[in-house]
Amino acid sequence: MNTQIIAIANQKGGVGKTTTCANLGIGLAQAGKKVLLIDGDPQGSLTISLGNPQPDKLPFTLSDAMGKILMDQPIRPGEGILHHAEGVDLMPADIQLSGMEVSLVNAMSRETILRQYLDTLKGQYSHILIDCQPSLGMLTVNALAAANRIIIPVQAEYLPAKGLEQLLSTVNKVKRQINPKLQIDGILLTMVDSRTNFAKEISALLRETYGSKIKVFSTEIPHSVRAKEISAEGKSIFAHDPGGKVAEGYRNLTKEVLKLEKQREKNRRCFSH
């Protein structure tokens, strides 16, 4: 099984990374894919939003898995992986992950510890999605070093030029120095309030500024109060409000992501002949 590893990254917080990771992951599972979600944020937002309100009480989290890799200790198959009712698996995170980030600084091959952990799981999943923390620290670099694709959620409230430039330069650096396979799938506009002209302007501006270099997904995720409520319930938007606009947005995003995959696979085959 050729595992697709997708990092959901933006060093700005509050742009819909966690919501996108959970709902795209569950969308892919509904499309028949075998999906593992990785919570790469010490705050544990993804872990909490998938129904684990106290991540610190979990017996095994991502920091334990990375710790075992650092110490060269074996990891049991499936160790610490949780199963969600909507068909995805989860490797949770808790606050210990911030301590792990500190210990990575002096570790040998510090950028690839997460990649080495994911290598132990690769044949078991068609897709692994990583919810990155809102910073460009060592954990995010680990996620970019492990991924072959990246999706960048951007809130449609203002032009994120500076932050985006910073993120893109980090992506290019990782691609050059550590992970030549890394490709940007696209920029995803989130929390779009279609009633305002402002969101339309930002959308047009983003497409104008980056569209020639980077795909901007044609799917836009609408702003919704209900989407905010669900993270407390441990369910996806598909379970909470299947007929709503946000669920439709994530269904369309899932289709776009799969279409992109097919296209790349086709191109790869053409090149290899």
Where are these regions (language model features)?
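P-loop NTP-binding core
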Residues: 1-273
